[in-house]
Amino acid sequence: MKRGSAALEVRELKMQTPTASCVLSTQRANFAKGGVPTDDEQATGLEREVMMAARKGLDPYNILAPKAAAGTKEDPNLVPSITNKRIVGCICEEDNSTVIWFWLHKGEAQRCPSCGTHYKLVPHQLAH
């Protein structure tokens, strides 16, 4: 009698478990037209977290390109830092092959020693 009840349990379990073809057809329905998944459908983990934050206009891991500013005293380029100073590299001119490196300290905006572009250090919190 136990053997019969065990067989019934196995049969019920098989009926509740989706088959491979059922799972595949469900996945295909979620893919973009043509059967290739979009980035949103395929992204997982940190990549998905970054994509969702970017949609909201956030950059929690500071991986996106910084927003360009005029570089004037009134509108300096903002440089995020977790400390009170940071080393900055300025290319100065578009076709320049060298980088001018200098220390940027917390406080007022500072100028590049070569071209005069203004930079300002701003506090940045690390994503935890």
Curated annotation (Swiss-Prot):
Gene Ontology CC annotations of this record: mitochondrial inner membrane; respiratory chain complex IV
Ligand binding (Zn(2+)): C90, C92, C112, C115
PROSITE patterns: COX5B_1, COX5B_2
Remaining remarks: On the 2D-gel the determined pI of this protein is: 6.0, its MW is: 14.7 kDa.
Molecular function GO terms recorded: metal ion binding
Record-level GO BP terms: mitochondrial electron transport, cytochrome c to oxygen
UniProt tissue specificity: Expressed in testis. Not expressed in brain, heart, liver, kidney, spleen, lung, duodenum, muscle, epididymis, vagina, uterus and ovary.
Subcellular location: Mitochondrion inner membrane
A Pfam family this chain is assigned to: COX5B
Record protein name field: Cytochrome c oxidase subunit 5B, mitochondrial
CDD domains for the chain: Cyt_c_Oxidase_Vb
Presequence positions on this chain: 1-30
Matches recorded under InterPro entries: Cyt_c_oxidase_su5b, Cyt_c_oxidase_su5b_sf
Keyword terms of this UniProt record: Acetylation, Membrane, Metal-binding, Mitochondrion, Mitochondrion inner membrane, Transit peptide, Zinc
Modified residues (N6-acetyllysine): K67, K85, K120
PANTHER family found in the cross-reference section: CYTOCHROME C OXIDASE SUBUNIT 5B, MITOCHONDRIAL
Family classification: Belongs to the cytochrome c oxidase 5b family.
Major localization listed first in the record, in broad terms: mitochondrion
Organism annotation: Vulpes vulpes
Function according to Swiss-Prot or TrEMBL: This protein is one of the nuclear-coded polypeptide chains of cytochrome c oxidase, the terminal oxidase in mitochondrial electron transport.
